[in-house]
């Protein structure tokens, strides 16, 4: 039992680091958002191949694990595409705070249906994770305004999709003997939505972009794919109600550190509070 506890936290920490580095550099591109999605979906393929090699290409093809794992991928990737729509109608400072607390859906579903329980110290860790999420979601500025109320609908869809995703990921892990199969189906789902992403653009194909820029974006996006891969393991060995808020709350800490080193960007007061809260919840969960 103790080994599993260490395993889930190690995998979660890999996710936190890779997502943190990814977040620090993901905006440093001139590519349209929909083409960034295409590159991200393609970056899932090498990780999926590594997963297949790890299980000697013995993919779990039973209907229940396959459908649940595909659902995980569609909820995550579909939510990302809907987020693009939300950002077309409202600035990030309105959209992101609403989406950032999506793990509350995971926590509630895990309590109700998975019967997951944590100690009083663990509850404190979850609360601190949400404090960090809110602090990092607070805007540095509030320039711009919403173009239409429809952004609330789109943001709500993302909130629900991403909140349910981690819960379904736990169900998928419980239904299959290996985490690798779950990730492979997630990658398939992401690739299947590439045509949808292309339709959301202005008609410019991905090959019309410079290969240098595409290569740079690919190496940034593969960090997200690696983080998603290790998140599946963290979710398998840990509790969904802990893993989801922990990963989402702590990745911005890495982003802040990188921004401080590279751009001398001093964290705001809310970000400092978020950093302290996030580090505190990691220390708490290391004992959970």
Which residues make up each language-model segment?
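Loop-to-transmembrane-helix transition segments
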Residues: 7-15, 58-82, 150-158, 206-226, ...
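Specific alpha-helical transmembrane segments that line the substrate/conduction pathway
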Residues: 88-114, 240-260
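Hydrophobic/aromatic residues within transmembrane alpha-helices
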Residues: 29, 86, 112-114, 172, ...
